[in-house]
Swiss-Prot record:
The chain crosses the membrane at residues 133-152, 159-177, 191-209, 219-240, 271-294, 305-330. Residues 1-132, 178-190, 241-270, 331-343 are cytoplasmic. The gene is Tmem120a. Keywords: Cell membrane, Endoplasmic reticulum, Membrane, Nucleus, Transmembrane, Transmembrane helix. The keyword Nucleus applies. This is Transmembrane protein 120A. Residues 153-158, 210-218, 295-304 are extracellular. It is found in: Cell membrane; Nucleus inner membrane; Endoplasmic reticulum. It comes from Rattus norvegicus (Rat). GO terms for biological process: antiviral innate immune response; detection of mechanical stimulus involved in sensory perception of pain; fat cell differentiation; monoatomic ion transmembrane transport; protein heterooligomerization; protein homooligomerization. Belongs to the TMEM120 family. GO terms for molecular function: coenzyme A binding; monoatomic ion channel activity. The keyword GTP-binding does not apply. Multifunctional protein involved in mechanosensation, and plays an essential role in lipid metabolism and adipocyte differentiation. May function as a potential ion channel involved in sensing mechanical stimuli. Mediates the mechanosensitivity of the PKD2-TMEM120A channel complex through direct physical interaction. TMEM120A seems to affect mechanosensation by inhibiting PIEZO2 channels, possibly by altering cellular lipid content.
Length: 343
């Protein structure tokens, strides 16, 4: 005896009933989520306001302490120093707290993204975004090495040069946006290592608009060779800095949101000093580029405004990179000598 044919409509109705039950559960979960979200928003506002009040009172306290310190007796100086160190420590704790609270974007992010909130609320999301930023720098650095090598030795075309410079503009613009978001999420990036990306963006934009001609051809090979070397050094820095940061984070000596940078910082002193000759050579190459462009600008045949406007950013990059690196090295030598005297 044959079984009755399946009822397609009945199966659909049973599936619909199952979906209805699941949907009711989803609705309840979503309602609970909305309630918790409102509670979270209120907690964020309360915490932000409390931190703002505390920071204001700390600033007032630090100012009063600074004014009265010269008149303090010698036996009270140690207590004043201890209070100052506690105030600085408290300010650092507030910085870590604010990394998990919504905040207003700075001028640059407001111009680019508007008032959208870019604060990531979990450690996992922050670390994932930081890790993606590091991979982005690594992959683009390798691509820039390949393209600059191709333009330098295989292709002599203004079109490919323009594509290379356009990639540089896009790369540095993207870095500035991502770094601003990371700063909002607790990354401690030193001022110059952020600002020099804005200078590099401007420089790449001017190079992009430089028309082909005698002055361009005189500087072209030097610029492409410098770009190759700079990308190679950046690759070395990423490779060794990422390993050093991993070890220091495991020891609890570095923050989880610390980033690799295109320069030298105090935490790199142990194990990464071998990078200093590469860095200083690159800094002086930037100075050489600036002097070359200034000499070209004095040539009677030079008609392009881009020559001088490329020389100035190269000079600024040299001054910023060289003296920032030199200051870090000087501070480390000074601290080591001070420590040895204490011993």
């Amino acid at each position: 005896m044959q079984s009755p044919p399946p009822d397609p409509l009945g199966d659909c109705l049973r599936n619909w009933e199952d979906l209805q039950q699941d949907f009711q559960g989803i609705q309840e979960t979503h309602r609970l989520y909305r309630v918790k979200l409102e509670e979270l928003t209120k907690l964020q506002d309360n915490c932000t306001n409390s931190i703002t009040r505390q920071k204001k009172r700390l600033q007032e306290l630090a100012l009063v302490l600074k004014k009265c310190r010269p008149s303090l007796p010698s036996e009270s100086l140690e207590a004043a120093q201890e209070l100052e160190s506690q105030i600085k420590e408290r300010q650092g704790l507030f910085f870590d707290m604010e990394a998990y609270l919504p905040k207003k974007n700075g001028l640059y992010l407001s111009l680019v993204l508007g008032n959208v909130n870019v604060t990531l609320l979990s450690k996992q999301a922050k670390f994932a975004y930081k890790d993606e930023y590091e991979k982005f720098k690594l992959y683009l650095t390798i691509i820039l090495i390949v393209i600059s090598f191709t333009c330098r030795f295989l292709l002599n075309s203004r079109v490919t040069d323009a594509a290379f410079n356009f990639l540089l503009v896009w790369y540095y613009c993207t870095l500035t946006i991502r770094e601003s978001i990371l700063i909002n999420n607790g990354s401690r990036i030193k001022g110059w290592w952020v600002f020099h990306h804005y200078v590099s963006t401007f420089l790449s934009g001017v190079m992009l608009t430089w028309p082909d001609g005698l002055m361009y051809q005189k500087f072209r090979n030097q610029f492409l060779s410098f770009s190759m070397y700079q990308s190679f050094v950046q690759f070395l820095q990423y490779y060794y800095q990422s390993g050093c940061l991993y070890r220091l984070r495991a020891l609890g000596e570095r923050h989880t949101m610390d980033l690799t940078v295109e320069g030298f910082q105090s935490w790199m002193w142990r194990g990464l000093t071998f990078l200093l000759p590469f860095l200083f050579f690159g800094h002086f190459w930037q100075l050489f580029n600036a002097l070359t462009l200034f000499n070209l600008a004095r040539d009677p045949e030079c008609k392009e405004w881009q020559v001088l406007m490329c020389g100035l950013p190269f000079l600024l990059l040299f001054l910023g990179n060289f003296f920032t690196t030199l200051r870090v090295v000087h501070q480390k030598f000074h601290s080591q000598q001070h420590g040895s005297k204490k011993d």
